[in-house]
Amino acid sequence: MRPERFLDCFASALPLGTPVKNPISYGILLTVFGYMLFTAHDSAVKLLVVTIPVWQVLFLRSCAILAGCFVYEGPSLVRKVARSPVVKPMIIRSMLLLIAWISYYSAAKYLQLAEVTTLYYAAPIVGTILATIVLREKVTVARWTAVGVGFCGVVIASNPVGLSISWPVYLALQAAVLWATGMVLLRKTALHEKSHIQMAVSNIMLILMTGTMAILHWKTPTGYELILLCTTGIFAGIGQLALFEGMRQAPVSVLAPFEYTSLVWAFGLGYLIWGDVPKINTFIGAILILSAGLIIIFSERRRRRTAAA
C-alpha cells in the first residue's frame, strides 16, 4: 500500500473537523489511544537515547511527521500553514513543549523513575486548573474527583519514597506545568484549525529548534536504530493526530484524567520489553487510574441523559 493510501485510510477513520454524534466519548477514545501510542513511542525513545542523541531523535521524528502531513495534504500544506490563524499560539506551544521535554529528560537523569513519574503527573491537575481560568470551563465535582483519584493511583503505583525538594524535582514539576499549559493551548487552537495543519506547524517549529543540535551531535544510525526511529515517527505521528483531534471533541477537564492511563500502558510495556514485574502497589494504582476514567465516563453519560430529558 502506498503511503498516501495508508494516510487516507487512517484519516477517513477520524472525522477530522466534522461533527460526531457523541463528541465527548469520541474525544476520550482518541485520547486514550493517543496516550497508548505515545507510551509505545517513549519506550522506543528509551531504547534509542542510549546511543542516539535526544536532539537527533526529536529532529528525525518531526521530519517524519511533517513528511506525512505533506503526503496527506499535498503542496497546499505550505499555503494553509502560512495562512493558519493558529500559527502564533502553536509556535508558543511548541516552545513550551520543547522546554518541557528538556526539563523532563534532565530530571530523569537524577531522579528515580517512580519519582519523576509522580511529579510529572501533576500535569492533569494543573491542566484542569488552567482550563477553568483560561478556557472558562465549568469543572464538575466528578471531574475534580477523577483527577484526584487518578493522581492518588499514580502516587501509589510509583511509590516515590524519600522524595525531597531539589533542582531535578523543580525540573520535573516545570515539565508538568509546561505540558499542561501546552495542552490548554492545544484545546484553544483545536477549535480554529484542522488537526493535521496544527501538526505541521508544531513539527516545523520542532525541526527548526532541534535541527542545529541534531546536526552538531549527529550519529549515523544502524539498521536496528533506523527501524526504531521509523517506529517513533509512526507512533508519534498517529498519536499526535489522535490527541489533537481528541482535543477538538472534548474539554480539557474531561480528558485530563485519561492522561494517567499512559502509566498503565507503561507498566505493561515495561514488563513485555524489559521484564519489569509490577508489584502489588502497581496493580492497586492501576485500578485507581482506571476508576478515574470510569468516573468521567459515567458522569458524562449521566449529564447527557439529564440534558436530553
Task: Show which residues each predicted segment covers.
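Transmembrane alpha-helices of multi-pass small-molecule transport proteins
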Residues: 6, 27, 51-99, 178-182, ...
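Hydrophobic/aromatic residues within transmembrane alpha-helices
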Residues: 48, 57, 107, 113, ...
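Transmembrane alpha-helical segments that form core, pore/gating elements
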Residues: 43-46, 54, 69, 161-221, ...
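Hydrophobic/small/kink-forming positions within alpha-helical transmembrane segments
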Residues: 35-40, 70, 94, 98-102, ...
